[in-house]
Amino acid sequence: MSQEREPFSPRPEGPEQVTSTEESLLVPLPHGKCEKENMDLEDTTLYRNKSIQTDIEDRSILEDNSNSQPIKAQPQRLPQPNTSALEQSEEETGKIQNGHVGLSNINGIHNGVKHVPADHRNISAPVSQKMHRKIQSSLSVSSDGSKKSKESSAYSQKPSASPEDGCVHCILTCLFCEFLTLCNIVVGQASCGICTSEACCCCCTEEMGDDCNCPCDMDCGIMDACCESSDCLEICMECCGICFPS
């Protein structure tokens, strides 16, 4: 059987053929760019996913190791400061201590320098010592004055012995010294007739003694007999001072 072949369609010649070839070349270019962009996006997403997975795995491994094994690594020392910075700070502190304080701008120009005398502390020390001594002396003087005032007030509070009190004391001492003789006189005067001329100078009888000027008076020489012995008088004065304080 004979097959009949169809003749090929004639290709366009001239400018139509050139335009068709250009269109055939330009059409597949956008499709290739899209495929490349898609490949790049897939690669970046895969890389990110892998990095995230590796980070998670590393963290889990570190946590397991920290929980299971003790820490054996020693802590590291902190970095030491520079010696130059330390020297500068020491120089600045030395200047401040010596009494030189300066202010400078950013350009390094000194606005003003304040000179403080270095011997200020040395001068203030003896002044403070003098003030301390003055305060101590004033305190001692005030304490002495307060003591003297207390003593004077105590002496002023004590009542001075009047001459009347001295007479009363003397009478009391004589009565205490001749208490027995006084008792005998009182008893003799009460029982009139028992009294003798030796014990008393007067009695209740008609016969009166030579020393008596009036009948039955108490002038029996008690004061003279008591004051004859000075020791007895001193003892009686002390006893009266104790028993009857003024």
Curated annotation (Swiss-Prot):
Sequence ranges of Polar residues compositional bias: 63-87
Tissue: Expressed broadly at a low level in the early embryo.
GO terms for MF: DNA-binding transcription factor binding
Entry's transmembrane regions: 171-188
Any one GO cellular component localisation term in the record: extracellular region
Membrane topology (UniProt): Single-pass membrane protein
Ranges in the topological domain labelled Extracellular: 1-170
Location of the protein in the cell: Cytoplasm; Cell membrane; Secreted
Cytoplasmic side of membrane: 189-246
Domain MDFI: 74-246
Gene Ontology biological-process entries: dorsal/ventral axis specification; negative regulation of DNA binding; negative regulation of DNA-templated transcription; negative regulation of protein import into nucleus; negative regulation of transcription by RNA polymerase II; negative regulation of Wnt signaling pathway; positive regulation of viral transcription; regulation of JNK cascade
Disordered, as annotated region: 1-93, 134-164
Chief location bin: cytoplasm
Segments forming a coiled coil: none
Keywords: Cell membrane, Cytoplasm, Developmental protein, Membrane, Secreted, Transcription, Transcription regulation, Transmembrane, Transmembrane helix
Annotated family: Belongs to the MDFI family.
Task of the protein: Required to control the activity of various transcription factors through their sequestration in the cytoplasm. Retains nuclear Zic proteins in the cytoplasm and inhibits their transcriptional activation. Required for dorsoanterior development. Necessary for siamois to activate downstream target genes, including gsc, during execution of the dorsal organizer program. Also regulates the transcriptional activity of TCF7L1/TCF3 by interacting directly with TCF7L1/TCF3 and preventing it from binding DNA. Involved in the development of lymphatic vessel valves.
Domains: entry comment: The cysteine-rich C-terminus is involved in its granular distribution in the cytoplasm.
Name under which the protein is recorded: MyoD family inhibitor domain-containing protein
Gene name in the database record: mdfic
